[in-house]
Amino acid sequence: MVSSRMASGETILVTGGAGFIGSHTVVQLLKQGFHVSIIDNLYNSVIDAVHRVRLLVGPLLSSNLHFHHGDLRNIHDLDILFSKTKFDAVIHFAGLKGVGESVLNPSNYYDNNLVATINLFQVMSKFNCKKLVISSSATVYGQPDQIPCVEDSNLHAMNPYGRSKLFVEEVARDIQRAEAEWRIILLRYFNPVGAHESGQIGEDPRGLPNNLMPYIQQVAVARLPELNIYGHDYPTKDGTAIRDYIHVMDLADGHIAALRKLFTTDNIGCTAYNLGTGRGTSVLEMVAAFEKASGKKIPIKMCPRRPGDATAVYASTEKAEKELGWKAKYGVEEMCRDQWKWASNNPWGYQGKH
């Protein structure tokens, strides 16, 4: 488990900290005694999430949180931020996430995910801040050679989103090889779901959700008429695809474990870790678990497979357990319970129905 030892007041920059995973991680950072600055362009998030974080942690810890509206693609925004504050490390969440959208608009994904990260590296290097946790993705494995996915598997992303994450990883590896003082951890998430147990913060995508759980939740609160399930003829027990769903609070704790590793390990280099549960759950199993948690029936519509979707993807978690001292503690039941608490408290997200 993640150490409960308080931090000694290190100052952390969290890019994309108003987003889904970022906001939950900021809560945990503040509770662990870190000082936090967020930079976010609010393209796919809202400032209300930051306000809710402040309410959750209370006025004392909230005084250690600062928000900056800025865009990593504008290197000047980063320059100003780093010239005003000395950061001990950076957690980099900022970016776009959506497989289908990336196929339709690849240049936007490479701009937001790759160019922005290169800008971040340049400014961090200029100000001699060389400890970095990067948000990567299980999509770098593509159709995996083996299940569960292990960190040293061959990487062959199958779409522009996955490739943008893979290229970020390659840039990180190259920079660390060139400048040995960098300490970089790449966290490959599987499928983040759930919400803070308070029901005050959660995932609030703009437009039609790209991912299963926010889609299910919007059907449950009658924002959408039915759930489209893409592919019901996979070679699995119920014909639907299998994924490794992980509670966002487990993910948040994984980032703190990674941060502590950066502060305590000199020769970490650039190392990748899977953050998942190690257990595969089918789409229909997830629907059934959400129906049980919410008491709502989810109407479904079976649709053809989407090109590039893998049959089954789940994580080997041994490396993170051994080297980070981190292990997911929440199961599917808790994921659905907390997702429903968020959805039922906020059926139209942070800003209500417009």
Swiss-Prot record:
UniProt entry keywords in alphabetical sequence: Carbohydrate metabolism, Galactose metabolism, Isomerase, NAD
Pfam families assigned to the protein according to its UniProt record, in alphabetical order: GDP_Man_Dehyd
- Highest taxon of the lineage: Eukaryota
Biological processes annotated in GO: galactose metabolic process
- First-level EC class: isomerase
The EC code for this enzyme is: 5.1.3.2
UniProt GO molecular function: UDP-glucose 4-epimerase activity
Catalytic activity annotation: UDP-alpha-D-glucose = UDP-alpha-D-galactose
Q: Which residues form the active site?
A: 161
Provide the residue positions that the database annotates as binding NAD(+).
11-42
Query: Could you tell me which pathway this protein works in?
Result: Carbohydrate metabolism; galactose metabolism
Q: Would the keyword Transcription turn up in this protein's UniProt record?
A: no
The cofactor required is: NAD(+)
Which portions of this protein are annotated as coiled-coil regions?
none
SUPFAM superfamilies per record: NAD(P)-binding Rossmann-fold domains (SSF51735)
Binding residues annotated for substrate, in chain numbering: 137
Q: Does the keyword GTP-binding apply?
A: no
Enumerate the InterPro entries for this protein.
NAD(P)-bd_dom (IPR016040), NAD(P)-bd_dom_sf (IPR036291), UDP_G4E (IPR005886)
An example of a Gene Ontology cellular component annotation for this protein is: cytosol
Q: Which family does it belong to?
A: Belongs to the NAD(P)-dependent epimerase/dehydratase family.
This one is known as UDP-glucose 4-epimerase GEPI42
